[in-house]
C-alpha cells in the first residue's frame, strides 16, 4: 500500500532520517524528517496564480503544536491560535533560504508547510524543518535550482571551538548563535547574534557551517534520486523584445529619474514612467490587434530597471544618489526628544528615520512566553513598527506582520548583549521603534536609535551599538560591495547584508541573497567594509551621547531590592497579608517577596520606595540594647506607657524612665499618639524595656554622662539582663499588671503569627506579590497541634 523510501545518515553525532511515501500522499511532495528526537512533516503543494504577478508567491509556514512536547495549550479554547513569534521567525528562515533558488520568472504559487510533530527540546527544529522543506521540494516536481541544508552554530571562545547543532544547554555557554543555510557552492542565508565577536571569528563560523551542510545535501540528493521524480522544466516567457523596446524608448527617462536623490520625487517619477510604459504597450497591442500579457510587461520593466541601475553603478563607479561605494549617508541624531518618555532618540540617516522610545517597568511587567521549550519570562522587549506613511503610501494600519517581527528580532539580537544583568538593573525594558521615513536599512536605524534611547534612559549598557546594511552588485566573477544601501539598491541588488555591533565586535549579523549564493570571500570583504561603516556611525553617535546617563528620569519608576532573613518573610507578610497590604496602601508601592529573602520594592518615586523600605526594615529589625528608635505612644497606664516601634513591636517605658525627675502622672508628660525617641535598655524574651530620659528627644542621640548613673542600683547590668525595672518589680510583672487591658488580650490569643509554624515554609510561594493577599484569600485558617492546616478548596 505504501511506497516507502527511507534514507539516513549520522550527522553531528545524531541520526538524521528522511522518509516519504507513507504520510500526506496528496501533496506534490511530502517528507518526514527525524533528527534525534525531533520530527517534522514537510509538505509542498503548487498551483497557478489567479492574477498576473511579478513576484514568486511563495508561502512558508512552520507550525509547532503543543502536543509535540506532550502539552495541552493554555487558554479557554485549549487550542493553538495565531502563529507565535518563534513560528514566524522559523518560517522566515526557511523562506529566505529557498527563495533565491527558484528560477527567474517562475510565478506559480508554492505553499510549504513544516509541521513539528515531535520535539525533544534539544535538537534545533529550524534545522530539521529546512532539511524537510528542501527534501520535499526535491521530490515535488517543482522547478527548483539546487539543494539546501541548514545548520545552527555555536562558539566556545575559551576553547576556540565551534559547535554543530548544539543543544539549548550547550548554547548557554556559547558566545554565538548562528543559523546558516547553503547549497553545494555558496552561502544563501545567515541569521545570528554574537557576544562582540571579531569579523574573523564570524567568518570562520560561516565557513564551518557551510562545510557541515554538504553531508546533508548529499543525503537529500540520494533521497530524491531514489524517489525518481523529475522536476517540471520551466520555460520562461521570452521578454527580451519588450525589454529592448523599453530600453530604446525610455532609457534616458529612467536614467534621469534614478539620478534624483530625493526619494519621494524619485518614486513619483518612476511610477509615472511605469504607468506610461504599461499604457504604451496596451495601446500598441490594441493597434496591432494582438493580446498583451501585462505580466510580461511588468517582468520586462523590472528586468530593464535592474540592468540599468546595475550597469550605471559598475560603469560610472557612482551610486543612485552619487555616493562612493563605501560612503555613508548624512546622519542626524537627537536624544531626549519626548519629554514624558523614559528615554527617546531620533536617528536620521539620509531618507531613513527612526523615532525610538523606551519605557521602564517592574519585573511584574515582564512578558510571559509560552514556548515549547518551557515557559519563560522576558524582561527586554523590542518592537518595530513600519507604518505606510514611512514610504508615502496611503493604507490602513495593520497588526505587525512577518517583516516587522523579523526586523524587531534582529534589532533585539543586536542590543541584547550590551544590556546589564538583571541583578544590576532589575527593570523590564521595552524599546519601540517607529519608522517615520524609510529608504533602506530601517532595521539598522532601529539598532542605532535603540542604543541611543537606552543611554538617554539611563540603562547602563556596556557600550553603544550601531548597525549598517550592505549591498552587492555581482556581474560574472566581478562584484561590488555597497555600504549603507538605499531601498532601490536593496530591491535591484543581489544581497542584503546587515551587520550590527560595538567598537569591539559584532553582536548581530543577517544576510539574505537574491541570487544563488555567494562565496566566503565576498562575505569577508563585506564584513570588513561593514566594520569601517559601523565605526563611522558610532563616532557620530558618540558625538551626541557617549555613555548612559548617571540615573533614570525623575518620572521613571523606581525599583530597589533589599535582603531579609528568610525567617522574617512571614512577619513582613503578616496575618493574611495584613502587613504587606498595609505597606502598599500607605506608600503606593508594590512589593514582591522571593523565597530567598529578596524583597523587591516598586514605586513611582524615591520617596515611596524609601517609605516602604523603612516600614519593611522596621518589621524585620530586632531591637537591640543600646539602640535608639522612634515610636508612637499607644497606651498610657499608671506605671508607664506602651510604645509601638519598629513596625508592630511593642515596648514599655516605665514611669521612672520617662523623665530624669519625679513625675506624679504619666499623662502629664506624654499622651497617646505622641512620637517619642526611645532607647532599648532591656529585653526579656518578647518584652522590651525602653527609656525616654536617656535620649535627646530633639536629636535622637543617646545622652552620655550622669543620667546613665541615676538610680544605678536599679539599672545595673545584672538587673537589666534579668529584666528588672527601676521600681524594683520585674519587667514581666509590669506587663502582667495590665492583665485586663487590650495588651493582655493580644498576648492571650489575639496573635495568630505567634502560633504559626516557625519555619514559615507554608507561608509563601516561589514569588509573592502584594496583590496576592486579599481580605478573602487567606490560605490558612485553622491551627492543629501548633501548625497551620491548609483550608481545602471549594468546588462548585
Curated annotation (Swiss-Prot):
Residues 740-755 have a biased composition (Basic residues). One of its GO terms (biological process) is mRNA catabolic process. Mg(2+) binds at residues 490, 496. Gene3D superfamilies: GHMP Kinase, N-terminal domain (3.30.230.70), K Homology domain, type 1 (3.30.1370.10), Nucleic acid-binding proteins (2.40.50.140). It is found in: Cytoplasm. It is an enzyme of class 2 (transferase). Residues 626-693 form the S1 motif domain. It catalyses: RNA(n+1) + phosphate = RNA(n) + a ribonucleoside 5'-diphosphate. It comes from the Bacteria. NCBIfam families: polynuc_phos (TIGR03591), PRK11824.1 (NF008805). This is Polyribonucleotide nucleotidyltransferase. It comes from Ehrlichia canis (strain Jake).
